[in-house]
Amino acid sequence: MATEKEIVVSGIRPTGYLHLGNYFGAIRNYIRMQEEFNCYFFVADWHSLTTHPNPKDLQANVMRVLAENIASGLDPEKVTLYAQSHVPEIAELYLLMNMLAYKGELERVPTFKDKVRLQPENVNAGLLTYPVLMSVDILIQRAVKVPVGKDQGQHLEMARNFAQRFNERYGNLFPEPEAFNYGDNLVRILSLDGKGGKMSKSENEMATIYLSDSDEQIRQKLRKAKTDSGGVPGEPMPESVANLIEIMKLVSTPDTVQFYVDAFNAGSIRYGDMKTQLGEDMVKFISPIREKAAALQADPTYLRKIMKEGAEKARVNAAQTLQQARNLIGLNYY
Ligand code: TYM
C-alpha cells in the first residue's frame, strides 16, 4: 500500500536550465526511487525568490524544470510533482520552525557565507533562513530519504537538527531525514573548466552541460573541456580528467570507460579521442530528454494539470503534519 512505503522528498530551484549535476546528483535517483518509495518531488519556487527573478522568467523556469523532470523519466502517475508555493502549509510550518532556528547557526552555514561573499548587496532574511525552509519542505511530508547532490549534505544535517529540536521540545513528530544516493557517496559533478567548482545553473555556461543543449553545443563543450598535457604512467589522475571519467561512467559503456582508464594508466591516453567519444555518448543520452522536454513545454495545459493534482496530494499529507505540529505546540484553542 502506498502509505506504507517510506517517504521521499526532494526539490530543485527554478533558477536556470537543468544540467548534468542536477541530473546525476538528484534526478537519476528520483527515477529509481519512484519505483520503491512514496515520492514527493517539487519545484522550489519560493527558494528561488531570494534573487528576485522577474515574474515572466520565474514562470518559464518553473514550467521548464517540471518538463525536464518528466522528460528525464519521472512518471506523474507514480510520484507527486508540485510547486512548493502551491503548498501553503509549508509556509506556516516554516514560521513555527523559525522560532527554533538560531541566528548564529544560520550565519555559519557555508552556502549562506558563500552568498554573502558573492552578493553582499542582497543578504535578505530569506537567504539566512533558507535551510529552515528547506528542512520544512522535507519534514512536513515526514520524509526519511532525500535524494540530493553533495552540495546539499550540510542542509540535510540541519534538517535533522531541527527535527530533533522540535521533537525534544514538543514531542515526537518528525523522523530524521537522510541525504540519499544509490551509490556510496553523494555526487558532485565538477564544471568542465578544470577549476574545481561544481557545475551550476547560472555560472560558466560553456563549462556546464545543460539538458537543453543542442547536439552541437554538447560536442563543442566537451571538446573544450579541460584535460592535462598527457598521462605519465604512475602519476595520479588530475581532477579534471577524473571528472570526465566520472561523467563518462554515467553515459558511456563500461568497456569504453575501462579503455580510457587503462590508456591513462599506460600513459597513452589521447584526450581528443576521449572527448569525441564522450561527446557522442552524451548526445545520445541528452537528445531524447531535450526533445521530450520541448514537447512537454509546448503543452502547458498538461503541465498545469500535473502540478495542480500534485499540489492537492502534497497538501493532504502536509496538512496532517501541520495539524499535529500546531497541537503539540499548543496552538489548538478549540
Ligand atoms: P539546486 O536547485 O541547486 O539543485 C538541485 C539538485 O541538484 C543537485 N546538484 C548537483 N549534484 C551534483 N553535482 C552538481 N554539480 C550539482 N549541482 C546541483 C543538488 O544537490 C540538488 O539535489 N536547496 C536545494 C533545493 C531544495 C531542496 C529542498 C532539496 C529546496 N528544498 C528539500 C531537497 C529537499 C537546491 O538549491 O538545489
Where are these regions (language model features)?
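Short, histidine-centered active-site or binding-site loop motifs used for metal coordination
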Residues: 12-14, 45-47, 144-145, 203, ...
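Conserved RecA-like P-loop NTPase ATPase core
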Residues: 69, 151, 196
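Short helix-capping/linker segments at secondary-structure and domain boundaries
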Residues: 103-107, 140-147, 252-260, 290
